[in-house]
Amino acid sequence: MANEALGPLFHNALIPQFVAARKKLNISQLEMDEILGVAKGLVSKWECGIRKPSGWLFCCWADALNMTIQLQPKVQNNDSQPRS
């Protein structure tokens, strides 16, 4: 899968969960910047889709929100298999 295809998945499926968790914990974006030790305004850029966090910062962000990241195998679609 090309990196371009991951953008909408990342922003539409994952980021709203991070935003909801941050708001539930009553943490501002600027406070989250400080917790993570990142530049002022970076969490805002992640949440708006302007920038994407590195894998490491993504894991740190989840941890700061008392969340875990779980990987699951892709569901195979029979239509995508080559036909002979």
PLM feature spans:
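Short, charged recognition helix plus adjacent turn
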Residues: 2-9, 56, 63, 70-84
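Key DNA-contacting residues within the recognition helix of helix-turn-helix
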Residues: 15, 19, 44-45, 54
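Short alpha-helical DNA-recognition segment
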Residues: 26-45
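DNA major-groove recognition helix of helix-turn-helix
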Residues: 47, 57, 65
